UniProtKB/Swiss-Prot annotation:
The lineage of its organism: Bacteria, Bacillati, Bacillota, Bacilli, Bacillales. Belongs to the bacillus TGase family. Pfam families: TGL. It catalyses: L-glutaminyl-[protein] + L-lysyl-[protein] = [protein]-L-lysyl-N(6)-5-L-glutamyl-[protein] + NH4(+). It comes from Bacillus cereus (strain G9842). GO terms for molecular function: protein-glutamine gamma-glutamyltransferase activity. It is an enzyme of class 2 (transferase). Its EC number is 2.3.2.13. HAMAP family: Tgl. It comes from the Bacteria. This is Protein-glutamine gamma-glutamyltransferase.
Length: 276
């Protein structure tokens, strides 16, 4: 269910020729049909969220095709022209290097980088935002970047919740409770949901849910009896906050609305929104 202000609406793309119009309409239809409430203050916020999701998917596929390597933190490596590898295996931005240039280099020269899946997801988020921000704004927000698991910049505002409905562009986690300790890096897999039942995970590639579970199950202890599974934890970029930095030159998606109800009372507790 999508709410703009106090109005429950069914949105639709008005320009079928704009880039990724079909994919955007699919995302809108999924959100409108879900039981979960997606609340936005304005239509521009919804437009930003929609374009952000599309760019997350694009960035995930670009990273997959870049040659970016899967490595544990002990074996991680990065391009020393832009990053310094820390003692824990993270990537620290070198002084006087614009974050925008360094993030783009990961996608241009993926073979010069290797790390594990959580860091890859954060890299995808940064790249998606870079597609919607002016470089000056991006560099100001994310100066002194450190890429290391979930240690992301304080200005990157994320929402993690349990029990939401899956939407393309969401980050979701597969858990492998009986992983073989010899390959502990396969205790789970962070993935971006691409839509149409496919996920991208750094290390497993683009696969269906069943294929990722099969891959993780192959890395369990001998005689394991508990299967890997897709958890109900979802992580998203907070569009309400991050939309305020969007470039004015970024084309807005043209969205019109079929009103369903205009007197909704919207209550939000934590990251869960309820309609009365």
């Amino acid at each position: 269910m999508i709410v703009i202000g106090r109005s429950i609406v069914h949105p639709y793309i008005t320009n079928e020729y704009e880039p990724f119009a079909a994919e955007k309409q699919q995302i809108l239809s999924i959100m409108a049909g879900n039981q979960e409430v997606y609340s936005f203050r304005t239509a521009d916020e919804l437009s930003f969220d929609l374009n952000l999701r599309v760019n997350i998917i694009i960035s995930a596929l670009e990273l997959f095709q870049s040659g970016f390597q899967f490595r544990t933190f002990q074996q991680s490596f990065c391009n020393p022209q832009y990053w310094k590898r820390t003692s824990l295996g993270g990537f620290e931005l070198l002084p006087n290097i614009p974050p925008s240039i360094a993030i783009q280099d990961i996608f241009k020269n993926g073979k010069l980088y290797g790390t594990e899946c959580a860091t890859a997801m954060i890299i995808i988020f940064y790249k998606a935002l870079l597609s919607l921000y002016e470089e000056e704004t991006f560099n100001r927000l994310f100066a002194n970047l450190l890429l290391y698991t979930w240690d992301y910049d304080q200005d990157l505002r994320l929402i993690t919740k349990t029990g939401g409905d899956l939407v393309p562009g969401d980050l979701v986690y597969f858990k492998n409770p009986q992983v073989n300790p010899a390959t502990i890096e396969w205790q789970g897999e962070n993935t971006i949901y691409l839509g149409n039942f496919f996920f991208y995970g750094h290390g497993v590639g683009v696969k269906t849910k069943e294929e990722i579970i099969y891959s993780l199950n192959e890395r369990r202890v001998p005689y394991a009896f508990i299967s890997a599974f897709l958890t109900d934890t979802i992580t998203r970029i907070d569009s309400r906050i991050m939309s305020q930095y969007a470039s004015s030159s970024t084309p807005q998606t043209s969205i019109s609305f079929i009103p369903i109800r205009d007197d909704a009372i919207v209550a939000t507790v934590g990251h869960t929104t309820t309609i009365y």
